[in-house]
Structures are given as C-alpha cells and as structure tokens.
C-alpha cells in the first residue's frame, strides 16, 4: 500500500526532455538547468543502439520468467552479481520487486549467465552515454574538462547495473483478490530514496511507475518512454557541485496487472576516490563549502548502513541549514 501525505501531480509536469542531437552548447546548458531545478531529465537521440537495448530487455525478460528456484540459485557468495527478491539492502527495506545486480567491472559472471554478452554490450553503451552527459555537464558549469567523467572512466570505478522486475499484482495478491475493491493494486515497488553514486542512467519498458519528488515535495509521475533514457543526479554530484545540483528523491510504484522492467546504470567512482565540492563551484557560488571531503568507500559504507528514505548527505555536511 502507498503511504505518505505527498500529493501526486500531473504526469511529466516540468520534467525536461533533452535532445542530445542538438548543438553541443545548447545541450550542456539544458542539462545544467535540469540538474539545478529537479535533478532529473530524459534524453532522446542518445546514440545507444536499439539492438543493444532490445537484446538487454529480452534477455532480462527471459531470466525473470524462469522458475523461482532457478533464479534464487543466482546468489553466489563473493561474486559481482546476485539475484534478490523483495529485500532491498541490508537494513530491512523491502518492495514488490525482484532484481539482478551486477558489478560492471568484474567479468566473473560471463561464464555463468547466458545473457552475459547482452549485459556487457549494454553496460558499455550506457557507460559511454553517462560519460558524455557528465562531460556536457562540466562544460555547462565551466569547470575543468572531465572533472566528473574521469571518476567513472577509471578501471577501478565502482559502478553497478541493476535490472528491476516489478511483477503484476496477481503474483502478490492472487487472481481471486484482484476483483476485491478493498485491495489496492497500487503498491510501493521500490521505496523513496536518492541514489548515492554520481549519476544514474535508467531505461524502462512501456509500463509506468517511476515518480520523482519536485521542489514543492510533490510526486511527479514519469511517463514511460522505451526510446528515452531517464537521468538523475546522485548524491556525489550534489556534493561536487556544492549543492547546486539536486540529488532527486524518487520511488517506483506498481499498478494493476502489467509487469514493469527497468534497467539502471549507477555511475560510481573508485572506492578510494576523494569526493568533495569542486573549488570552482565554491568560488562561483555565494555560499560556503557545504560538504566535507570523503572517499566514496567511506560514504558508501555509511550510506548503506541507513534505511532507504534516510538523508545520507546530512552526515557529511560542514554546516547545518
């Protein structure tokens, strides 16, 4: 059941759609504006090959269609991939979701998952898109080139790919209950949170469910567009821009009898990378340095010790609002 008092506003209200085929300076300005105002936008004409997208989606569908015992067997210890069902993190958060989680830099899964080729091609494509968006961001902010993209280009980058499958309601309630008016078919598939990494590049099938929180604290439903990628600012990018960009709070709901599939690339830096406000961002903004300097490993450890909805960045502020 969906809880909370936040009001839901119209679908796609104020969500920027950025055409990556436009003139470069125009694209960079639009990205900066979107990151400042909402921390979320869609990109079209992004250059990711449709064959790569389709292969990834079909192989994911094939995997989640397997019997439960086969899927649950993909939970090896100390491996860069795993299957999960309902459990989100290690602190009691749960949702109406099953997922596959891959560490993008370790090839150990290649011989064990039948769709490894599709996964590898997809990772390379969205990683390149993330780097391009981050370089355009740096240009729009007038900070040194590759200030952001260098962190995810390293061979040691701690990026992950997560494939979420939100099954139809009858798998949770049973077909007999679907006609019961007292049973709400709208559930929280993945609870309210921000992403701790630098940037997230997400694509979903034609089924809705994603919502983002705007500056008024209202939920904006994002219409599904399989031809576009959704991009959102993560906690680390908010820190590096000294709070100029917004790490947007978002969640996923499940509706009715349709199955939703989403694939998210979380662009993260190496564990030892030092993260803090860029000097150029502190000098150009009329406010003090808002965040301490820390390593991604330190932040990741602290962040994952909290619940999904907790405000992780508060632990690393240098001054209180």
Curated annotation (Swiss-Prot):
<keyword id="KW-0560">Oxidoreductase</keyword>
<dbReference type="Pfam" id="PF14226">
    <property type="entry name" value="DIOX_N"/>
</dbReference>
<dbReference type="InterPro" id="IPR026992">
    <property type="entry name" value="DIOX_N"/>
</dbReference>
<dbReference type="GO" id="GO:0009686">
    <property type="term" value="P:gibberellin biosynthetic process"/>
</dbReference>
<dbReference type="GO" id="GO:0045487">
    <property type="term" value="P:gibberellin catabolic process"/>
</dbReference>
<comment type="function">
    <text>Catalyzes the 2-beta-hydroxylation of several biologically active gibberellins, leading to the homeostatic regulation of their endogenous level. Catabolism of gibberellins (GAs) plays a central role in plant development. Converts GA9/GA20 to GA51/GA29 and GA4/GA1 to GA34/GA8.</text>
</comment>
<dbReference type="GO" id="GO:0046872">
    <property type="term" value="F:metal ion binding"/>
</dbReference>
<comment type="similarity">
    <text>Belongs to the iron/ascorbate-dependent oxidoreductase family. GA2OX subfamily.</text>
</comment>
<keyword id="KW-0479">Metal-binding</keyword>
<dbReference type="Pfam" id="PF03171">
    <property type="entry name" value="2OG-FeII_Oxy"/>
</dbReference>
<dbReference type="GO" id="GO:0045543">
    <property type="term" value="F:gibberellin 2-beta-dioxygenase activity"/>
</dbReference>
<comment type="pathway">
    <text>Plant hormone biosynthesis; gibberellin biosynthesis.</text>
</comment>
<feature type="binding site">
    <location>
        <position position="250"/>
    </location>
    <ligand>
        <name>Fe cation</name>
    </ligand>
</feature>
<feature type="domain" description="Fe2OG dioxygenase">
    <location>
        <begin position="156"/>
        <end position="269"/>
    </location>
</feature>
<dbReference type="InterPro" id="IPR027443">
    <property type="entry name" value="IPNS-like_sf"/>
</dbReference>
<feature type="binding site">
    <location>
        <position position="195"/>
    </location>
    <ligand>
        <name>Fe cation</name>
    </ligand>
</feature>
<dbReference type="InterPro" id="IPR050231">
    <property type="entry name" value="Iron_ascorbate_oxido_reductase"/>
</dbReference>
<feature type="binding site">
    <location>
        <position position="193"/>
    </location>
    <ligand>
        <name>Fe cation</name>
    </ligand>
</feature>
<keyword id="KW-0408">Iron</keyword>
<feature type="active site">
    <location>
        <position position="260"/>
    </location>
</feature>
<dbReference type="InterPro" id="IPR005123">
    <property type="entry name" value="Oxoglu/Fe-dep_dioxygenase_dom"/>
</dbReference>
<protein>
    <recommendedName>
        <fullName>Gibberellin 2-beta-dioxygenase 4</fullName>
        <ecNumber>1.14.11.13</ecNumber>
    </recommendedName>
</protein>
<dbReference type="InterPro" id="IPR044861">
    <property type="entry name" value="IPNS-like_FE2OG_OXY"/>
</dbReference>
<keyword id="KW-0223">Dioxygenase</keyword>
